[in-house]
Amino acid sequence: MTPSALVRATLAPRADGGAVGIALLVVRVASGLFFMFTGIGKFVTFQGEVDHFAEFGIPWPTVMVVLSGLLEAVGGLCLVLGLLVRPVAIALAVNMAIAIATAGREVGGPFHLGVAPALLVLMLLLAWSGGTAWSLDRRLLSREEAA
């Protein structure tokens, strides 16, 4: 696969415009904002998050809080902008699967066994669909195709 074909495969949306495109835009922006706020929150309440990660049995809790917080904050921003939607959605889906397997198992509750699984499904949807017409991915793809 050529680099150009790889870029097209990564950025090309599966649904553009119409009601489906608008629905995917809402899902992408809303989940992106949610991830941005939870990622920033991990740094605002840093020591508490480290303590929770340690309780959940996550190795290297300090490092993992930083990595998870950065992934959620930066990944959320990327989703809002529609930048690298597929790889970011896959990374966030893995993050949610880990949250379900660790905090969900230890704590349960409406977030870890309600919101996290819903976000996992939404990230899988975005990994499948891509950024749609209203995304930076689409603009980058248009430039790539024009070149």
Descriptions of predicted regions:
Residues 1-44, 63-70, 74, 81-147:
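Extended, low-polarity transmembrane helix blocks
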Residues 7-8, 44-60:
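Membrane-interface interhelical connector segments
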